[in-house]
């Protein structure tokens, strides 16, 4: 954890990420933005999946110092901070940051694979609907339309859709957006199964002069 935190700090990746974040406070008693985002980053690096797990970081002063933080904030402070960032602002913040982290790995010809997988859901979650689900029939699910580098198995983007939006047409807009963001780093070939061989997806590719299989 400490070594990776030091890497993020030394390379400037964490600093750029914090500077671009749209989170802003007006109260003088509010936590520092760097402490909030640093806590989130340390939690992700530690493999935490729930806000409650953040408590385990409170005693790790070394990792916090590696990111230039004053302290690790509480789980409640982190939850409230992330709730302040609307979806449009978070997308404009995170997508360039994520793309910056992978662009240099795409300097050689590569293949973009498209795949859809069904994620069964338990409990109440937004977008959970009963749709095509061969492993758990009649179980609500999400559909994950995934775009990844074929040779590296490196995920570039995921379109999370409701359980009824399993057809390839629901990935068309996300595919076009990703290709536009890649610019001169576009794949030599876009590859998908027969479900993606429909007119809408093919027009999206041909309109950009993008080879496909």
Give the location of each predicted region.
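Short hydrophobic alpha-helical runs that function as membrane-insertion/retention elements
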Residues: 211-213
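Alpha-helix N-cap/loop-to-helix initiation residues
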Residues: 167, 197-198
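Acidic/histidine-rich, metal-coordinating catalytic segments
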Residues: 115, 187-197
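Catalytic cores of alpha/beta
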Residues: 200-203
């Amino acid at each position: 954890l400490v070594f990776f935190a030091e890497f993020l700090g030394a390379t400037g990746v964490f600093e750029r990420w914090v500077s671009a974040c749209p989170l802003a406070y007006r109260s003088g008693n509010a936590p520092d933005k760097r402490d909030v985002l640093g806590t989130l980053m340390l939690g992700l690096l530690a493999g935490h999946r729930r806000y409650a797990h953040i408590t385990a970081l409170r005693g790790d002063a070394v990792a916090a110092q590696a990111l230039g933080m004053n302290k690790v904030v509480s789980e409640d402070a982190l939850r409230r901070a992330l709730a302040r960032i609307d979806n449009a602002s978070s997308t404009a913040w995170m997508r360039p940051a994520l793309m910056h982290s992978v662009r240099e790995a795409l300097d050689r010809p590569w293949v973009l694979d498209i795949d859809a997988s069904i994620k069964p859901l338990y409990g109440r979650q937004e977008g959970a609907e009963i749709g095509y689900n061969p492993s758990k029939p009649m179980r609500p699910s999400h559909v994950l339309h995934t775009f990844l580098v074929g040779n590296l198995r490196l995920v570039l983007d995921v379109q999370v859709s409701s359980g009824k939006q399993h057809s390839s047409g629901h990935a068309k807009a996300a595919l076009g957006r990703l290709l536009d963001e890649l610019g001169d780093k576009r794949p030599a070939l876009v590859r998908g199964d027969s479900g993606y061989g429909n007119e809408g997806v093919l027009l999206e590719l041909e309109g950009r002069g993008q080879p496909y299989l």
